[in-house]
Structure formats: C-alpha cells, structure tokens
Amino acid sequence: MILLARHGETDDNRPPLRVQGSRDTPLNETGRLQAAELAERVRRENLGELYSSPLSRARATAEVVGAAVGLEPLLDARLVEADRGEWEGRLFADLEREEPAGWAAWQRAGESFRFPGGESLREQMDRVMAALDDVRRASPPALVVCHGGSIRAALCHADSRGLDAFHTWEVPNVALVRL
C-alpha cells in the first residue's frame, strides 16, 4: 500500500495563485499547521517507510510527519513537481490574460502538453511512476509526500483516460490519496 500526500500550503498556493512548479518555495505558517494535521491523520497507518520530494515544501511536510511516526524521510528527486519552465513564478491570472492559447492548452492538458521551456506531462508521469514502482517493490506500506501535479500524474497512470484526465482531480494541500 502506498499513500500519497501533497505538501502543506505555501504562499504561492494562496490567492493570487502563482505557478510553483519546480521552484523551491517553503511552507508558510498554515502549511506547517497542515503538516502537523497530516501527521496525526497518518499516525494509525503503520507506515514502514516515508519518502519525499526534495523540494523544501514537501521535505518540511515529510519531516513533521516523520517526527510523529518515527521515520526519516527518504528523498527522491523523481517526485518533484513538473518543471513548468517559463511559467514558474507567474500569476495564473497573468498567464490566462497574456498567453490565452497556452493557458487553454494547459486546461486541456493531455499527452502532448509541454510547459514552455519546461517538462511535458508525460515526462512527469513517467518519472513519478518510476519512483512509485521502486517504492512499491521496496517497502510498502509507505507514505510519499510530494506535489499536486505528481499525484495527478499517478492518478492519470491508473485512469483509462490517461493524461487527458489530469484536471479531473482536485488535490488540495495535505490531500491524502491511497494507491
């Protein structure tokens, strides 16, 4: 059994929303409180291992959980959020207004979508699934703390619609998904 958890809140997750991607943004105060709440939620899960994206927002969330359950987070760079290239750090509203064709393509997502100057959703899904396959072989039950896009990519892998389903799921901060 693998549990996926999204990191706690960062300032980029609060209005006005910004594209985070692979930028290393820290948890804010709400995010630190959410991490403690997540730790309480998973305390009963009898976890054998704890994995995390190395980005500080995921790592800090995993460290709070790890302290509560007695596990040290194992970092895996394949779990990071998509490299969103030229869009990273930009406001969603600005992208929608200034790059309407690109924004519309992102809202459709799918196999062919690539962030300008960044990674494709297929590349993200392939690396996330490689990491999760290694976790599954090595150490279930495990908690994997990562990112909304990484969790969506894993859900797309399990869905017959593939990456066309990317925007089907809402993955709020500290969401917990059982694979």
Predicted regions and their residues:
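Short active-site segment of divalent metal-dependent hydrolases/proteases
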Residues: 10, 150-151
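Active-site-proximal alpha-helix that buttresses catalytic centers in soluble enzyme cores
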Residues: 5-72
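Short beta-strand scaffold positions
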Residues: 52-53, 126, 145-146
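Generic beta-sheet signal
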Residues: 2, 138-146
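Phosphate-handling substructures
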Residues: 25, 69-127
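Glycine-rich phosphate-binding loop signature in dinucleotide/nucleotide-binding domains
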Residues: 43-46, 135-140
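Domain-level recognition of soluble alpha/beta enzyme cores
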Residues: 161-179
